[in-house]
């Protein structure tokens, strides 16, 4: 395994916020993902790498996408503080925060601008949910020409099947799949 070029690599953490982490997930719990992701955030920031914390938020819901759906599964409950980053990552210095209004972290944000201005060509992705926020961001990153590494054990989904499908059939077409320990060894 080759070492990561820290000056050209960013860690992008998707939706590790209280209202999403608290949900039911598989194959890993929200707590397990936060534990792995927070190790990555600390290691990347200690090395001086660019770390992006992405969250989904809205003031009143009017700026969120509202397509007609056959399912209500996409409805997020928004109790007070639902969009706050989990404490394990919220106070780590030298991270860049992005707020999105949809699944992916590129559309309607300055993520691409921030990465390009720093000369970053590789993204390490983790977070919740494997098949929604992480997958959509990965597809957008692929279209923008970024190399990608997916940290399989630092992400999770609504079901074991969703996570397995995306990791087996989608991510290998967009980048490389590693685990947390492998990434930490590459720093």
Curated annotation (Swiss-Prot):
Q: What is the lineage of its organism?
A: Bacteria, Bacillati, Bacillota, Clostridia, Eubacteriales
- Annotated InterPro entries: Isochorismatase-like_dom (IPR000868), Isochorismatase-like_hydrls (IPR050272), Isochorismatase-like_sf (IPR036380)
Supply the name of the protein. Uncharacterized isochorismatase family protein CA_P0030
Species: Clostridium acetobutylicum (strain ATCC 824 / DSM 792 / JCM 1419 / IAM 19013 / LMG 5710 / NBRC 13948 / NRRL B-527 / VKM B-1787 / 2291 / W)
EC nos: 3.-.-.-
Q: List the disulfide bonds.
A: none
Q: Which UniProt keywords apply?
A: Hydrolase, Plasmid
A GO MF annotation of the entry reads: hydrolase activity
Looking up Gene3D superfamilies in the UniProt record yields:
Isochorismatase-like (3.40.50.850)
